[in-house]
Amino acid sequence: MTLIIAHRGASGYKPEMTIPAYELALQQNADGFETDVRLTKDLQLVGIHDRKTSRVANSDLIVSKSTLKQLQELDFSNDQAKASVMTIREFITLALDSGKSLTLTIETKHVTKHHGLLEHKLNELLTEFGLNTNQHEKVKIVLMSFNPFAVLRFSKLNPLIPRVQLKEKNYPLLHLYPNPGNPEIVGPGIELLIKKPDLITKFKDQGKKVFVWTVNSPQDMRFCLERGIDAIITNYPDIAYQEREAFLRSK
């Protein structure tokens, strides 16, 4: 069955990558969560997509040049109920405390000075929670990156964690180094698959699972469901759940 992964939480409704966004995703029957991860100046793992905070918070800080305390002082609410920056520790704790079976897909974001350090810090945290072998009865971890060298580094660091090589047509490194680390999962954007649906068969014939991002319209959700995509990554887990239920009833 196609998994529904809440992209940055239920980010179509709540501020992205905040605890309220993931709490709502649980209520909306998501099968898992997606988050980006960056390192702060004091080497803490936080859930932020951009290198700067201006798009999501009330101040403009560079994440890698700011301490966790400085980031925690910002307001990430986007005019909703007050929300703070989320640490990856809080992200994992929320998933474990839910008692639900969840797949956590974690996308690494990098700056040059932290070369390789992010993956090490993340693996240390997963080990602390007993999630580094992917044998937990409820919570499973998947690592994702557009950077093929990040996928390769993590494959050497911890081969027990499945890896997703994210793909988009304008990412030049992927043309030069298409499959370093031999990732088990391919992560194409929905726009790429709509233009080239034959890629799904190609990936499946290679023995790869397919996780598709960011699938937000009912039409695109049905496109994925009809083609047996392994996971839909969406800002609207409630709509994806409704579409999946309707699809399953129609079979």
Q: Which stretches of residues belong to each language-model region?
A:
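Phosphate-group recognition and catalysis centered on beta-loop-alpha active-site segments
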Residues: M1-K251
